[in-house]
């Protein structure tokens, strides 16, 4: 039985795959298995995996019709034999001693998870300095008790972490399929059942940031997955309830939800408003009243107007039910007022022109 199982989803990664597999093959800690999960590749990636499997028995090949990275990782979880779990993306690569050092960190510190640093590399092979990429920076060092603040200040990426397989199986931790940002949900689930963590401030993982990667598309308004974090929150809350953890982690859930909602409201497409609003209402109904009221203010048109999201504020005013928006008349007036824009102001001639919904409605001129 291997000590570490490394799960590697593979989909049309032929351009990068050999570099990734070579980095796994030369690990200084040899007692590993590499589960290459082919997600219906069409570019010869499967043949590359087969080549490595024939040359090194530690490589294993699993296959599925194209179903996305979450389903591929779940297939890897079901077939992993190791005591510890690690993940890698097919366009990234490990430093030669990442397995050895993370294993030593988690065992020596007797913690439930160990986390290392990473190097972020643009596709042109330019290494980005850590100060330019605050999200990936480690804000802790050594052994730490896991708190809500620590969970939120630590990046959710899977590839710079080592997990205990027993904890994953005990609590049924897995990935929500069909959505992007599935690694968020796995991370939240695991950290809610783990008690301690060890941080290793060494850059042992090389993350290639591509323009067409999930993270590269985060700030693209046309990306349909930009609000998938809301769906992953649904999955996360179901996990908490299934394991009777919702009360213990109520504060954490609310904080994560507010952060996700604040992020998503700036990027939602008008066609996505109804579904996002539906998810919001579901949480509002199942959470305790005090928590629900806290979430409620983040869907209030007044709050959304402050964020500059006029269209979503308008949508909620027109579709809000059950008193969600508080004093509906006030909110509607605020939304209408937000559409009242200063068209032209000339101090020299003392002329003011106003527009409403693009139509000029008022022109004032001071008498001489």
Question: Model regions: which residues?
Answer:
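Short beta-strand/loop segment that forms part of the nucleotide-sugar
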Residues: 31-40, 60-65, 90
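A conserved acidic beta->alpha catalytic loop
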Residues: 23, 30, 38-47, 67, ...
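Short, well-formed alpha-helical segments that are part of the catalytic scaffolds
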Residues: 12-26
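Glycine-rich, basic loop-to-helix element that forms the pyrophosphate-binding segment
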Residues: 64-80
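Donor-binding/catalytic cores of nucleotide-activated saccharide
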Residues: 69, 90-224
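Membrane-interface aromatic/basic loop that binds lipid-linked glycans or pyrophosphate carriers
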Residues: 270-368
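Cell-envelope/extracellular polymer assembly enzymes that use nucleotide-activated donors
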Residues: 2-5, 23, 33, 185
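Short aromatic/hydrophobic "clamp" motif used to bind/position activated sugar donors
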Residues: 85
């Amino acid at each position: 039985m291997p000590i570490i199982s490394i799960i590697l989803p593979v989909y049309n990664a032929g351009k990068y795959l050999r570099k990734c597999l070579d980095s796994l093959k030369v690990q200084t800690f040899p007692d590993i298995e590499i589960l290459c999960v082919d997600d219906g590749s069409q570019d010869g990636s499967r043949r590359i995996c087969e080549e490595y499997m024939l040359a090194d028995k530690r490589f294993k090949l699993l296959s599925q019709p194209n179903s996305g990275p979450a389903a591929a990782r779940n297939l890897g979880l079901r077939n992993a034999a190791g005591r510890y779990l690690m993940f890698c993306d097919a366009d990234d690569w490990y430093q030669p001693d990442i397995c050895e050092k993370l294993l030593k960190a988690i065992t020596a510190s007797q913690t439930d998870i160990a986390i290392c640093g990473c190097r972020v590399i643009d596709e042109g092979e330019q290494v980005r300095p850590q100060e330019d990429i605050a999200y990936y920076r480690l804000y802790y060092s050594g052994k730490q008790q896991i708190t809500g603040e620590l969970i939120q200040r630590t990046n959710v990426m899977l590839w710079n972490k080592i997990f205990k397989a027993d904890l994953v199986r005990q609590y049924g931790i897995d990935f929500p399929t069909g959505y992007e940002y599935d690694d968020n949900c796995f991370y939240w689930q695991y950290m809610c059942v783990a008690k301690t963590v060890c941080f290793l401030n060494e850059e042992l993982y090389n993350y290639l940031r591509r323009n067409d990667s999930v993270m590269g598309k985060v700030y693209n308004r046309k990306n349909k997955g930009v609000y998938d974090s809301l769906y992953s929150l649904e999955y996360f809350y179901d996990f908490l309830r299934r394991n009777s953890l919702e009360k213990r982690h109520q504060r954490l859930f609310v904080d994560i939800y507010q952060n996700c909602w604040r992020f998503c409201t700036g990027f939602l497409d008008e066609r996505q408003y109804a579904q996002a609003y539906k998810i919001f209402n579901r949480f509002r109904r199942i959470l305790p009243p005090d928590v629900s009221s806290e979430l409620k203010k983040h869907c209030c048109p007044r709050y959304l107007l402050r964020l500059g999201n006029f269209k979503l504020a308008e949508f909620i005013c027109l579709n809000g039910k059950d008193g969600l928006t508080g004093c509906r008349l006030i909110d509607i007036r605020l939304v209408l007022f937000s559409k009242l824009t200063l068209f032209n102001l000339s101090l020299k001639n003392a002329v003011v022109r106003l527009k409403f919904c693009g139509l000029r409605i008022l022109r004032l001129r001071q008498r001489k």
